[in-house]
Amino acid sequence: MANLNQIQKEVSEILSDQKSMKSDIKAILEMLGSQNPIKESLEAVAAKIVNDLTKLINDCPCNKEILEALGNQPKEQLIEQPKEKGKGLNLGKYSYPNYGVGNEELGSSGNPKALTWPFKAPAGWPNQF
């Protein structure tokens, strides 16, 4: 067990450390208070970054080539207009007689002998289903 003198020494050391930290915190707060507000500092840093990037972009040789190519283009672009929009494909009803397809009960064919599904085997064929 720790004796009373050791505990007193440790408590006094902690107290002195706490007082020194308190004075350090006050000094830091005073130093921060004397500086520009955070918003102004951020705006200054952002402006510096934008200026540096603008300078890099303007000094880039590829940018100069692009600007020269754009400068050599005519002011008005001549675009050919399509002659006439066609009506497109005539997708009306299929006019070819589709005998032999479709289901008679659906009315999709005029042929009464049209194939139906499921397939019905004619008489004499082996029953597969």
From Swiss-Prot:
Keywords: Coiled coil, Disulfide bond, Host cell junction, Virion. The keyword Lyase does not apply. One of its GO terms (cellular component) is virion component. It is found in: Virion; Host cell junction, Host plasmodesma. Residues 1-31, 38-59 form a coiled coil. InterPro entries: Caulimo_virion-assoc (IPR004986). It comes from the Viruses. GO terms for molecular function: DNA binding. Residues 122-129 are annotated as: Capsid binding. Pfam families: Cauli_DNA-bind. Its main location: virion. Homotetramer, through coiled-coil domain. Homotrimer when interacts with icosehadral capsid. Interacts with capsid protein, and with Movement protein. Plays a role in virus cell-to-cell and plant-to-plant transmission. Interacts with virion icosahedral capsid and movement protein, thereby facilitating virion cell-to-cell transmission through plasmodesmata opened by viral movement protein. Also interacts with aphid transmission factor, attaching the virion to aphid stylet when the animal feeds on an virus infected plant. Aphid saliva may later detach the virion, inducing release of infectious particles when the animal feeds on a new plant. Belongs to the caulimovirus ORF III family. This is Virion-associated protein.
